[in-house]
C-alpha cells in the first residue's frame, strides 16, 4: 500500500520541487504517475483511501461517461446526416439549414455557465441525470414536429442544448477527480474517442434509419431511448468522487470561492485563455465541416457523375455514410496519435501538449484546402485529403482537455469548462455553420440555378476553414510560452501552498528564520 504524507506537512512538496530543478530527480508528474499506477495495481478491487471508489469502479464510471458523450454527439450529428431531407421537408435555404445547428449550439453555450457554476458546488451526478432526462425528452418531441412549423423544430433543437450543457461541463471534472497524471490523460483520450465516433455514428445511424423507415423523423428517435439507459447507469452504477482529493492527498472538502473570484482567476490564466481560443478555431472548423461536409460531397458527386441526390422522396446518403466512417476512424487515430506523441515528447519538453496541438492545426490547413480543390475532379482524392486533414485536427481533443485540468484548480474546473464552452461555441461552431450557409447563398445570388453553382458556392465558403486552422495553430504556439508557469501555480494551489483567494495569489507563505514569511511565487516556481 502506498504511503501518504501527513496533511499538515508541506515540506516534502517544497523539497521535491527543489530536487526537481536542482538535483535532476524525476519530476512530480512522473512520480505521481508512478504512485497512481502502483495504487491501481494494489487497490484494483479495493476502495481508494481518498476517493472512496475502487480503481475498477472508476474505470466503469469513465465508460459510462464515454457512453453518454457518444450519445450526445450521435444526436447532434444525426441532424447533419439527414440535412438534405430536413431542408427539403421544411423548404428552407442554405442559411436556414445552418441555423438548425446554430440554434442548438447557442442554447448549449448560454446554459453552460449555469451548469458550470452548479457543477463546482453541488452533486454532479444528480445534475447530469436531470439534464440527460430533459435532453432525451426534447429530442423525442422534436421528431414529431410537422413540416409546417420550422420555427418549432428550431426551438426543440435549441432545448436539446440543455442536456448537453449539463453533461459536458461536468464529465471531464469527474474524470480528473478519479485519476492523475498519465492515467488521467489516457482516460481523457478514451472519453474523447466518443467525439469522432459519435459524430460518425450520427451520420450513419441517421442515414440508415431514414432509408429503412422512409422518413427522416425516425432518425431522431434512436437516441432518446439510449439516453434513458444512460440515466439508469448514472443512478445505479456511477459514484461521485470528492473534488480534488487525489491532488491534495486528503479527502477533506475544498473551500469554494465566489463565482466572481473564480472568473477573475480564470481570466488571469493565460494558458487557459489562449488554449480556449485555440480550441475555438477547432470548433469553428469542425462545426462547419460536420454540418456541411456530407452536403458538399453530395453536390460534388452530382457534378462529377451527373446524378440526382433525392429521387423518390428520399435522398442518397452514400456520402454521409463514407464521411461518417472517415470521421470515426480519423477521430480515434488522431486522439491516439496526439496523446502518444505528447506523452513521449513531454519527457524532453514540458510544453509538449500545446506544441502538438499547434502542429496539428497548422498541418491540417493545406489538406483541408486540397480536399475542396479536388472535389469536382476526384472524389477519391477528396476523401484522402479529408482523412489526413481530420486526423491532424483530432490530435488536440484530449490534449486541450488535459491542459484545462492541470492549469485550473479543482474548485474552478466546471466553471472553466463552461467558460471554454461559451467562448469556443460563441466564436466557433455556433456561427460557422450559419456563416458558411450565408456565404454560400450570397455567392449563388443572381446566378442561374445549377448543381455546379451550388457546389462552387459551398466550396468557396468552406475554404475559410483552412485559414482559421492556421490562426488556431498560432494560439496554441502562444500557449506554450505560459504553460509551465501556470501548471506549477495550479499545483501549488491544489497542495494548499497558495491561497485560492486571488488577493494573495502572487505570494506564498514559507518558513524563514523560525517564522512564516510571504515570498513571491516566482521564487518557488524557479
UniProtKB/Swiss-Prot annotation:
PANTHER family: PROTEIN SPINSTER HOMOLOG 1, SPINSTER. GO terms for biological process: lipid transport. The chain crosses the membrane at residues 59-79, 98-118, 126-146, 159-179, 187-207, 218-238, 272-292, 321-341, 355-375, 384-404, 419-439, 463-483. The keyword Mitochondrion does not apply. GO terms for molecular function: transmembrane transporter activity. It is found in: Lysosome membrane. This is Protein spinster homolog 1. Pfam families: MFS_1. The keyword Transmembrane applies. Keywords: Lipid transport, Lysosome, Membrane, Transmembrane, Transmembrane helix, Transport. One of its GO terms (cellular component) is membrane. Belongs to the major facilitator superfamily. Spinster (TC 2.A.1.49) family. Residues 1-44 are annotated as: Disordered. Mediates the rate-limiting, proton-dependent, lysosomal efflux of lysophospholipids. Selective for zwitterionic headgroups such as lysophosphatidylcholine (LPC) and lysophosphatidylethanolamine (LPE). Essential player in lysosomal homeostasis. It catalyses: a 1-acyl-sn-glycero-3-phosphocholine(out) + H(+)(out) = a 1-acyl-sn-glycero-3-phosphocholine(in) + H(+)(in); a 1-acyl-sn-glycero-3-phosphoethanolamine(out) + H(+)(out) = a 1-acyl-sn-glycero-3-phosphoethanolamine(in) + H(+)(in); a 1-O-(1Z-alkenyl)-sn-glycero-3-phosphocholine(out) + H(+)(out) = a 1-O-(1Z-alkenyl)-sn-glycero-3-phosphocholine(in) + H(+)(in); a 1-O-(1Z-alkenyl)-sn-glycero-3-phosphoethanolamine(out) + H(+)(out) = a 1-O-(1Z-alkenyl)-sn-glycero-3-phosphoethanolamine(in) + H(+)(in). It comes from the Eukaryota. It is a multi-pass membrane protein.
